[in-house]
């Protein structure tokens, strides 16, 4: 199991700091499949490819550019990750969550994380936006396994409110103001890259999940460990396997994300102004 030392996180942060000319991000945004266009709206952008940052892995998923975009968005100092890392790409949980700790060292206090996922709740429809209230992770090791990096947080962190209640209320008010229907529910993590089987989807529903996907949870756990506030959104790009009698298609997921882009962008920007 690959682990990183506090010094390695510092080296990555120092490399980024040298490129930022004093800029300090307050909010980290991690954007999911088909949702990366928000990064193109950042004002006075400073773009840093992941490959320029020591110890940082690169993104190989379709539609994930693999770069940090620093700048102003909705009146806030932000850093947008255009493209995230996934364990199905062969990266460890430590790799996937590595950027969160690096950006925490640069000053980010809030994480806004988005993903594209399959709806398990039969009351949902493709295209719905879901506010994440909690998550389920039953597979694999934790991103906090191994020696604890005490500079970031305690050995046994509390996970009872990973998704900050006050930020969820901000999201509700923003959605109401924009007249954007907003679902709420539990996101369940599956490692992928294969989509879930109908039996797995039925199990997820029994356990209380409303959507299933392959990201978000590792980053949210590490952010909570770092003491960051977390706000999470899921775009239900499709109904999960077995809900409808049709196969799942990765291109359709990306297309659905692009189609929902304007609504999603408006909602996230409205939340940004209040977090």
Residue ranges of model-derived segments:
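Non-catalytic positions within long, well-ordered alpha-helices that form the structural scaffold/packing
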Residues: 104-107, 205, 224
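Generic non-transmembrane alpha-helical segments
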Residues: 15, 19-22, 166, 170-181, ...
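His/Asp/Glu-rich mid-to-C-terminal helical/loop segments that flank catalytic regions of hydrolases
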Residues: 240-275
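Histidine/lysine/aspartate-rich catalytic loop segments that bind and position anionic ligands
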Residues: 136, 140, 146-193
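Short acidic/polar active-site loop segments enriched in Thr and Asp
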Residues: 109-110, 210, 229
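Zn-dependent metallopeptidase/amidohydrolase metal-coordination segment
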Residues: 214-252
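Metabolite-binding pocket within alpha/beta catalytic cores that recognizes anionic/polar moieties
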Residues: 1-159
């Amino acid at each position: 199991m690959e682990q990183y030392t506090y010094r390695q996180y510092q080296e990555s942060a120092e490399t980024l700091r040298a490129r930022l000319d004093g800029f300090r991000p307050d909010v980290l945004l991690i954007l999911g499949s088909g949702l990366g266009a928000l990064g193109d709206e950042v004002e006075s952008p400073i773009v840093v490819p992941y490959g320029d940052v020591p110890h940082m892995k690169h993104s190989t998923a379709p539609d994930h550019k693999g770069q940090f975009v620093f700048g102003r968005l909705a009146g806030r100092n932000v850093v947008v990750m255009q493209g995230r890392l996934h364990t199905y790409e062969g990266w460890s949980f430590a790799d996937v969550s590595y950027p969160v700790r690096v950006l925490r060292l640069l000053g980010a206090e809030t994480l806004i994380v988005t993903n594209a996922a399959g709806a398990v709740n039969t009351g949902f429809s493709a295209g719905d936006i879901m506010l994440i209230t909690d998550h389920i992770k039953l597979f694999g090791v934790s991103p906090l396994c191994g020696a604890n990096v005490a500079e970031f947080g305690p050995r046994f962190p509390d996970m009872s409110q990973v998704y900050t209640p006050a930020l969820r209320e901000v999201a509700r008010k923003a959605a109401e103001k924009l007249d954007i229907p907003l679902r709420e529910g539990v996101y369940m993590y599956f490692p992928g890259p294969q989509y879930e089987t109908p039996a797995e989807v039925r199990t997820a529903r029994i356990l209380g999940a409303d959507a299933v996907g392959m990201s978000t949870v590792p980053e949210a756990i590490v952010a909570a460990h770092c003491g960051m506030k977390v706000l999470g959104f899921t775009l239900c790009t499709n109904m999960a396997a077995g809900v409808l009698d049709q196969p799942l298609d990765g291109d359709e997921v990306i297309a659905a994300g692009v189609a929902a882009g304007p609504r999603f962008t408006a909602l996230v920007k409205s939340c940004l102004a209040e977090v």
